[in-house]
């Protein structure tokens, strides 16, 4: 990716007769136009909020972590866009500072959007704003996770919030980038009074424990999360040639902790799945 590559394209009738139109990128960044051309390298995350709003997370380089939104019915490159987050102070209701590199993950519940940031150590934070109310770069934002806030993960340790999934007022975050960083954290009452607990990572990988972080098979990051009913599925990745990419599952209606409730369902040839590569 290079500067100017961050674009959003829309496909209509994509299941039968696909037609594509560019709806974001290469604007001026002002007066309703999308973000400026020749500036942003990557659209790192996308989500539809409440069925009506397209939310786009940008970034790769320092200061590029911005959140833009547009009504799904009226997005074009030059109309309908609003910058909602980024380039602020990170305090007093303002969004994150202009040193943050990337919005790696997005999740929503109703009109509330959760934003996962980061590239470098200490940037792995989660922010919340209600798009149904006031949500601008300088108002409406609350940091809910990271920097030990609300009993969350340590400051200056984790690089990215790789993945997010929300169910009602509960949010799950997948962290990581470097050895032993692949963890899943759960936030309860995340829309009002957030409280975090670690539910995956740093286990032994056997007897119901979550994935291990032993020498030679240390998991780097939780690249993906999906929630189907009460089943939380986790995509955990390690260095090429060690454990590779694995899929794990836990029933969140029961006990899910780092050492209880987990089952590996794919990877390392398990259940006729893929092997270890690299």
Region spans (language model):
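Beta-strand C-termini and the immediately following turn/loop, strongest in propeller blades
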Residues: 59, 118-119, 176
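Entry beta-strands of beta-propeller and related beta-repeat scaffolds
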Residues: 51-56, 110-115, 169-173, 227-235
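Trp- and S/T/G-rich repeat-edge/linker motifs of beta-rich repeat architectures
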Residues: 1-42, 49, 62-102, 108, ...
């Amino acid at each position: 990716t290079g500067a100017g590559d961050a674009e959003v394209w829309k496909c209509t009738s994509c299941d039968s007769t696909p037609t594509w139109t560019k709806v974001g990128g290469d604007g001026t960044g002002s007066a309703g136009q999308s973000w400026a051309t020749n500036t942003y390298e990557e659209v790192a995350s996308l989500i539809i909020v409440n069925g009506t709003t397209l939310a786009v997370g940008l970034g790769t380089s320092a200061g590029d972590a911005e959140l833009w939104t547009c009504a799904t019915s009226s997005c074009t490159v030059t109309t309908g866009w609003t910058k909602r987050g980024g380039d602020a102070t990170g305090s007093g209701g303002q969004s994150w500072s202009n040193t943050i590199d990337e919005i790696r993950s997005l999740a929503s519940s109703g009109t509330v959007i959760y934003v996962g940031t980061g590239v470098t150590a200490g940037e792995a934070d989660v922010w919340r704003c209600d798009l149904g109310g006031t949500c601008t770069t300088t108002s409406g934002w609350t940091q809910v996770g990271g920097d030990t806030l609300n009993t969350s993960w340590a400051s200056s340790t984790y690089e990215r919030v790789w993945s997010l999934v929300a169910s009602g007022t509960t949010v799950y975050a997948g962290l990581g980038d470097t050895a032993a960083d692949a963890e899943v954290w759960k936030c309860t009452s995340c829309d009002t009074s957030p409280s975090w607990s670690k539910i995956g990572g740093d286990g032994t990988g056997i007897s119901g424990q979550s994935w291990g972080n032993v020498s030679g098979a240390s998991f780097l990051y939780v690249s993906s999360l999906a929630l189907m009913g009460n089943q939380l599925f986790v995509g955990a990745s390690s260095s090429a040639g060690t454990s590779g990419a694995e899929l794990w599952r836990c029933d969140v209606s029961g006990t899910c902790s780092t050492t209880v409730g987990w089952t590996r369902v794919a990877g390392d040839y398990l259940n006729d799945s893929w092997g270890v590569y690299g």
